[in-house]
Design a protein with these regions (language model features):
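Short intrinsically disordered terminal tails
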Residues: 3-9, 88-101
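Catalytic phosphate/metal-binding cores of nucleic-acid and nucleotide-processing enzymes, i.e., regions
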Residues: 10-93
Length: 101
């Protein structure tokens, strides 16, 4: 028996790391899409929280986007990757917990 395909919840929220230059392109308006590794089964309506990292460390800056368009099966996309389109974003600042090892 074939297994039914399980879609993620439409209101799912995922956190991903992002570099400073990527977040700058988003907030300045020059980028409205992302090419990403499919770490989760994203779908339209999901929220991505992009956490800015500089030299491997979180800066506390985040950008929230809601997926408006998405494809992972187009001819030019590597297996395991997807293109995500979004219309708007929200910028926020969050506290960073400094872990002392």
């Amino acid at each position: 028996d074939p297994k039914p395909i399980e879609l993620p919840k439409k209101d799912a929220i995922y956190r991903e790391k992002a570099g400073k230059s990527l977040l700058k392109e988003i907030t300045e308006g020059s980028r409205r899409y992302l090419v990403m590794k499919m770490r989760h089964k994203y779908r339209i309506g999901n929220t991505l929280i992009l956490q800015e990292h500089d030299k491997g460390m979180p800066t506390g800056n985040i950008v929230k986007i809601q997926i408006a368009h998405m494809t992972d099966d187009s001819g030019g996309i590597l297996p395991g990757y997807c293109v995500i389109g979004f219309l708007d974003f929200e910028m926020e600042k969050e506290e960073i917990e400094n872990e002392v090892i």
